[in-house]
Amino acid sequence: MTTAAASSPRTYQVRTYGCQMNVHDSERIAGLLEQAGYLRAGAADDTPDVVVFNTCAVRENADNRLYGNLGQLRPRKDQHPEMQIAVGGCLAQKDRSEIVRRAPWVDVVFGTHNIGSLPVLLERARHNAAAEVEILESLEVFPSTLPTRRESTYAGWVSISVGCNNTCTFCIVPALRGKEKDRRPGEILSEVRSLVDEGVLEVTLLGQNVNSYGIEFGDRYAFGKLLRACGDIDGLERVRFTSPHPKDFTDDVIAAMAETPNVCPSLHMPLQSGSDDMLRAMRRSYRSERYLGIIEKVRAAMPDAAITTDIIVGFPGETEADFERTLDVVRAARFSSAFTFQYSKRPGTPAATMADQLPKAVVQERYERLIDCVEEITWAENRRLLGKTVEVLVAVGEGRKDERTGRLSGRARDGRLVHFDAGSLAGQVRPGDIVQTVVTYAAPHHLNADGEPLAHRRTRAGDAAEAGQRPRTAGVSLGLPTVGAPPPMPPAASSACSC
């Protein structure tokens, strides 16, 4: 029998669904697999040795999407029996053995608390020729200790906490991610510095509720202190965070945002509903007046701040008057963008069994009215930037039409998406570089800048992108098994082409 060590390295692919937390978890999954000797499958490889689904249980029809994708893989699995399929993330934490019952060709099911076990579970499933299902009820190892394969040379996610202590009636995340666990500030800042040392310019601090950071070690001002400490890190040009909860938003955090030059003038703060009755039913612990009061304070401290939000339409019991109150708050808040969702039942949440579930047609009609209202406001807010100079961090994959239009794309400091013409700098601007340019056109969801750029600054992140390099966070040694023997690293190329 040929041993794994003697065979060629096995390849992997990670498919991610859901929020930024899942995106960052997938970076950890990739880092774990590469540390264990796997190689990332090429884009054209439709039969990798391992396919990992990192799932979401929050989005509508998340289970149907997963089982549909698993069904599409079954013929390939039948043709290539050595192929392994693993399912992790929130849906795996929720459904557990149900996944293997409905899709018996799945090899491994792992949860949100034991990502670090994946390489061992894959090896065990291969050895035993049987599915491995391992779901833990509490965090095994804080995810920051796991190796990470970063997808960007210029921007990185850094978790400051996992889990959530809130009990929103529509949300299943606390049941799947557990109670809030906070990293200590020194660990967070060490990770941020290591990313900056590798050329990263922008860091997003991640947590289910970043404003409650510090509750585990008894410091209610910890998040403001953390933002200010990030301001002392040389080379860190942009700091963002997501998501805060309005009930925990303090004046100290607003002051820290305004006082710290590298904290971006942007804020994503979920509203969910503008109706106090709906907020009470959602168990959101704030009311619309407090929400608008926070926005007023943020804009007083940071007049150019772009504020974005999440809104749910059609929550059980929502009346036309409740919905009109949501529109009123949207008009008063003047969001620069909004993620809007039609309510759908999440099994296991209190809202799923509430009376007065709304007909689909009513929810759809309100949803369309909300979209129209939001787009009217975001378009007006974007038009205010016509003729203004913006600083753009050039990104990869932000502009779906870039190849056809000849533009490049990136994010302004306030988080707005900017498509720009490189002009005489065409071929010189790389992902991770900084460009200053003037806004010439505004749409509801983006800005265009079609004049000659005013300035271009080459960065170490751009150098790394050009060389095909990515920053990595090594984490700590977990004694993981090595599967196969990775080939030597190729020489760096000399040139090359988001509660």
Swiss-Prot record:
Instruction: Please identify the protein, giving its name as recorded.
Output: tRNA-2-methylthio-N(6)-dimethylallyladenosine synthase
Describe the location of the TRAM domain by residue ranges: 383-453
* Catalytic activity line of the entry: N(6)-dimethylallyladenosine(37) in tRNA + (sulfur carrier)-SH + AH2 + 2 S-adenosyl-L-methionine = 2-methylsulfanyl-N(6)-dimethylallyladenosine(37) in tRNA + (sulfur carrier)-H + 5'-deoxyadenosine + L-methionine + A + S-adenosyl-L-homocysteine + 2 H(+)
For this UniProt record, give its keywords in alphabetical order, as a comma-separated list. Answer: 4Fe-4S, Cytoplasm, Iron, Iron-sulfur, Metal-binding, S-adenosyl-L-methionine, Transferase, tRNA processing
The UniProt family comment states: Belongs to the methylthiotransferase family. MiaB subfamily.
Q: Which gene encodes it?
A: miaB
Q: Where is region (Disordered) located?
A: 449-476
One GO molecular-function entry = N6-isopentenyladenosine methylthiotransferase activity
